[in-house]
Amino acid sequence: SAQAAKTSKREFRAAWIQCVNGQFQGLSKDDMQRTLSYQLDELQKDGANAIIFQVRAECDALYRSSYEPWSKFLTGRQGQDPGWDPLAWMIAECHKRGMELHAWINPYRAKTKTTSALAPNHIAVLHPERVFSYDGQYILNPALAVNREYICKVVDDIVRRYDVDGLHIDDYFYP
């Protein structure tokens, strides 16, 4: 509405779009873009002015990362290049609609219960000593300075290379 547009810079009316639920897994580029376009259009109609897009669910990436493998939540196989960059596309689509795009990362979760195979360049494969297992998941040990520094590198990579309007660090999966 016109009123929503007037207050869009004073009110943060955001919606979270997650990948970890598998809604995109195995979709073609066109189908995923069609799904996301529909979601963005509906959220815009509802007055949302920001999208919080999950780009790192398990030390993987829904963007062309300098550090981590492509997410299995895109193609069904971790490390498989989907042939496009969902984060770059989402930034363009959100900005075209006058919406902000905030990148959402899960900093320490390294493997969900549903992931059976990790890519060869995954942190848990390269440095298993930096990860612990708990309840079927792998978690980067937050007590290790090297892991905290690694997450800072990942964040720096995102904010330097992408025109994100914000960054959300979200995790509540610790034992």
Residue ranges with predicted function:
Residues 10-34, 103, 107-162:
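Active-site-adjacent "subsite" loops/lids of carbohydrate-active enzymes
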Residues 27-46, 73-97, 149:
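Aromatic- and glycine-enriched glycan-recognition loops and surfaces
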Residues 34-61, 161-165:
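Catalytic domains of carbohydrate-active enzymes, especially glycoside hydrolases
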Residues 59-63, 109-114, 175:
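Short catalytic/ligand-binding loop motif for oxyanion handling, primarily in non-cytosolic enzymes
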Residues 46-82:
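Aromatic-lined carbohydrate-binding/catalytic grooves of carbohydrate-active enzymes
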Residues 2-4:
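Boundary at the C-terminal end of the N-terminal hydrophobic targeting segment
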